UniProtKB/Swiss-Prot annotation:
UniProt cross-references to CDD domains, sorted A to Z: F1-ATPase_delta (cd12152)
A GO term from the CC aspect: proton-transporting ATP synthase complex
InterPro entries: ATP_F1_dsu/esu_C_sf (IPR036794), ATP_synth_F1_dsu/esu (IPR001469), ATP_synth_F1_dsu/esu_N (IPR020546), ATP_synth_F1_esu_C (IPR020547), ATPsynth_dsu/esu_N (IPR036771)
Localization: Cell membrane
Family membership noted in the UniProt record: Belongs to the ATPase epsilon chain family.
Membrane topology of this protein: Peripheral membrane protein
Protein name stated in the entry: ATP synthase epsilon chain
Pfam families reported in the protein's UniProt record: ATP-synt_DE, ATP-synt_DE_N
Keyword Secreted: no
Keywords, comma-separated and alphabetical: ATP synthesis, Cell membrane, CF(1), Hydrogen ion transport, Ion transport, Membrane, Transport
């Protein structure tokens, strides 16, 4: 099977770069599966997992939004934040989840609910990917 080059980049620098058989992820418009030769496109990404299928394994990268650029032989993911499953600090993600849940449970008027919901979604995504629940 032909491969496609994938780069995952954040403002802090590159996170992942490799040749893979298939890239699948969730964009704002729905689930995308990308193989070599895919038509060029750009799509905004949701907080979620990028699944990178190789011949004998699947690697996971947690992304916190961003954009996906597809060319026939290359996929570039420009993410606000990204971590491979192996790089995720589970204790830190669990703490972030607890903080977000506490903010959402708080009855204070100064809590930014939308921001707390996004923080919770990011933390849960990181935990799911670290435990390979995809």
């Amino acid at each position: 099977m032909k491969t496609i080059h994938v780069s995952v980049v954040t403002p802090d620098g590159p996170v992942y770069e490799s040749e893979v058989e298939m890239v699948s992820t969730r964009a704002q418009s729905g689930e995308l599966g990308i193989l070599h030769g895919h038509i060029p496109m750009v799509a905004p990404l949701q907080i979620g997992a990028v699944r990178l299928k190789k011949a004998s394994s699947t690697e996971l990268v947690a992304v916190s939004g961003g954009f996906l650029e597809v060319r026939p032989d290359k996929v570039t993911i420009l993410a606000q934040a990204a971590e491979t499953a192996e790089e995720i600090d589970v204790a830190r993600a669990e703490e972030a989840k607890k903080r977000a849940e506490m903010r959402l449970d708080s009855k204070q008027d100064d809590v930014d609910v939308k921001r707390a919901e996004i923080a919770l979604k990011r933390a849960v995504n990181r935990l799911d990917i670290s435990q390979r629940k995809f």
